[in-house]
Amino acid sequence: MGLQISIRESGDVTILDLRGKSTIDGGESELLGGCLKELIANGVRKLLLNLADLTQVDTTGVGVIIGKYISLRDRGGELKLLCPCGRVLEVFRVLRLLQFISSFEDETQALASFRPKGYVARL
């Protein structure tokens, strides 16, 4: 299966649910890069990549994620990861990606991490 991308929002955080694989040979990394580039160009500054259903990523896919992380950081934004697992997690660990890109196992905690410190939700 190639890469499928679903986009949803939670407050001011844009969440990309990735399913399948992100590799150079199938053009999936280019698809991911184009999607992220368009979101950033349209003003998105808080991105959460849900990797729970991403089964494979190669160095091209990792390069896309790192490039967009840097692009967002330089614009005052943030890119974070949700639920990297299996082979994807192994690749991220080997490349030490998780040392500078925040990663979460729980979506609620990931979303809360985008809020300013001391933020209290008003009911």
Residue ranges and their predicted role:
Residues 22-101:
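Amphipathic alpha-helical interaction surfaces in cytosolic regulatory modules
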Residues 12, 86, 108:
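Residues that form or immediately flank small-molecule/cofactor binding pockets and catalytic motifs
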Residues 3-34:
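STAS-typified acidic loop motif
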Residues 93-94, 112-116:
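Short secondary-structure transition/capping segments
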Residues 6, 82, 104:
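General small-molecule cofactor/ligand-binding pocket signal
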Residues 102-106, 110:
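Short acidic-hydrophobic, aromatic-tinged amphipathic segments that line or gate anion-handling sites
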Residues 1-10, 115-123:
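Non-catalytic signal-transmission and effector/linker regions of two-component phosphorelay proteins
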